[in-house]
Amino acid sequence: MTNIHPESPEDFEFIETPAASCTTPADDCGVRTTSYPAIKNAPVPADAAGSDSFSNTLLILLLVVIPWYTARQIGGGLKTTIFFAIFTTIPILMAFWSIASSISPRKNEKAKYAGRPVEHYLHFHSEHDRATYRGKSKIPMEVFYEKYFAGEVDFKMDALEALEFRHDWANFRFTMGLFKHFLFGFIPELLVHSRSQDEEQVRDHYDRGDDFYAWFLGPRMIYTSGIISDIKKEETLEQLQDNKLAVVCEKVGLKPGDTVLDLGCGWGTLAKYASVHYGAQVTGITLGRNQTAWGNKGLRAAGIDESQSRILCMDYRDAPRVPGGYKKITCLEMAEHVGVRHFGSFLAQVNEMLDDDGVFFLQIAGLRKSWQYEDLIWGLFMNKYIFPGADASTPLGFVVDKLEAAGFEIKGIDTIGVHYSATLWRWYRNWLGNGEKVKAKYGERWYRIWEYFLAYSTITSRQGGATCWQITLVKNINSTHRVEGINSQYGLTGAREAAIASVGKGSLPSAHVTFKA
C-alpha cells in the first residue's frame, strides 16, 4: 500500500514499512538473548577487542623513546629529537594501532561466535578475493565495505542478518584505507570546519533529493531517533516518531504562545507538531533548501500562518534573536555537525539566545568512552560516507563539560541508543522496500552505502557502540526559577503520558496534520 504525502513538494510515494524478515534463531551462544518485538534482537551479542587492552602508556613511550634514541645514536640533543619526532610520529601511530587492533584479545568471551566460514556469508566476484578470504581467513571490515560499495562482493543473505554474524567473516584491524581517511579527511575537516564547509556539506547531503530521504524516513520525514513506548509490541515508525515529538514538547514544558527556536529543524515536523498541538510560535533553522520549502509548505497545509511559525534557510550563527530570548530552544541531532572546534561557542550562543527562565533541549548522538575497535571503524565510515564534518559525536563527558562551561545546568538526561536502533531498523526495511526506485534514480553504489549504513547502525546503536542522549537544560544562574520546572521533569515514559493527558485527549497527538482544527 502506498500513499502520497500531503506536504510533499515533489511527486513521489511512500510505502508502508515492510514486515521484518525472519531472524536466524539464536542458538545457545553463551549469553542471554532477547525476543522483544520493538527491536531487532541480537542473535549473538558478542564483545570484541577494545580500549581495555589498548595501552596509552606504551604508545606514548614509543612516541618519545624512538626519536630520542635515534637522535642519541648520532649525538643529537633535544632539537634533533624533535626533528626526528616529526617524521616518526605518524608511522609509529599507524604501526601501533594496526598491531594493537590485530592482536588484542576480546573484551570477554562469554558469547560464542557461530563459527561459520567466510563463504557462508559472502560471495566475492574475483578468484583472488575468493582465495584470500575463505574459511577462517576474515576480511578487514574497511576493506569489505569498500569492496561492497564497488560491487566486488555480495552478501549471500539479508545484509543486516549477515552483519549480525560479522565476527565470523570480518576482523576489525586498522587498514591503510582507514589511516588515509583519518589523516587526510577527518583531521583536516576537524581543524578547519568553516562556515562554507558546513554549508557545502549540508546542502550536498540534504539537498540530494527529498525522495532519497523519504524512501527510508517515511511520511514523518524525521531524520532523528524515535522513542519506543512498549517493548512488547512493534510500533510503527510513525508511532515512534510521534512518541518522540510528544516527549520533546513535554520535557521542555511547552505552552501556548511560547517562542521556540528549533536549530537544525530538518523538514520541519517538530515545528509543525509544536505549532498545531501546543500553540507554540516556532522558528526553524536549516541550511537545506529542500527542507525549508518542505517545512513551510507543511506548516501552511496545517493551517499555521507564517506570523506564527516559519522555517528559515540559514546558518545557525545567523538565527534571528527575539526580545528577552526564546522561551524554548531545541536542537535534535544537529549539534554533531557544529564540530568539536565550534561546539563551545555554539552552546554559548544558545545560552545567549535563551530566556533566563527558558529551557534548552539537546538531543545528540555520541560514542562510548570504553570503545571497541569496531566502534571506531564504524565512526570513520560514517564520517567518510554519511555525515562528513559531524565530528562532535563524542562520549557524554565531553558534552556535559561543554554544556556546564557554557552556563547550563542539566535538568535531566535520558540515553536513547536502543530507541535509535529500533528507528534505524524500520528505516532499513523502508530502504529495502524502495530499493529498485533508489537504484533506478541514484544507482547501485548509493543504494549499497545506505543499506550498509542503516543495517550496521541498527546493530551498533543497539549494542552501545554509538548512542544518543536527550538532555534537558536550564540556565545556571541564581534567578532561574527552578521550582517551576519540577512538574515537567520527566523521563521518557512520563513525558509521553503527559502529552496524552495534556493535549492528546486520551491518545497521543499525531504529527500527520493537514489542517489545524
UniProtKB/Swiss-Prot annotation:
Matching Pfam families: CMAS (PF02353)
Q: What is this protein called?
A: Sphingolipid C9-methyltransferase A
Grouped into one coarse class, the protein's main location is membrane
Cellular component terms per the entry's GO annotation: membrane
- Chain's gene name: smtA
Spell out the subcellular localization from the entry: Membrane
Task: Please give the catalytic activity noted in the UniProt record.
Answer: a (4E,8E)-4-sphinga-4,8-dienine ceramide + S-adenosyl-L-methionine = a 9-methyl-(4E,8E)-sphinga-4,8-dienine ceramide + S-adenosyl-L-homocysteine + H(+)
Question: What does this chain do?
Answer: Catalyzes methylation of the sphingoid base component of glucosylceramides (GluCers) at the C9-position. Sphingolipid C9-methylation requires 4,8-desaturated ceramides as substrates. Glucosylceramides play important roles in growth, differentiation and pathogenicity. The methyl group at the C9-position distinguishes fungal glucosylceramides from those of plants and animals and may thus play a role in host-pathogen interactions enabling the host to recognize the fungal attack and initiate specific defense responses.
Name of the top EC class for this enzyme: transferase
Give TM regions.
Answer: 58-78, 80-100
**What family is reported?**
Belongs to the CFA/CMAS family.
Q: Which InterPro entries match?
A: SAM-dependent_MTases_sf (IPR029063), Sphingo_C9-MT (IPR052290)
Q: Which residues bind S-adenosyl-L-methionine?
A: 223-224, 286-291, 316-317
Instruction: Output one GO BP term.
Output: glucosylceramide biosynthetic process
Positions of glycan attachment: 290, 478
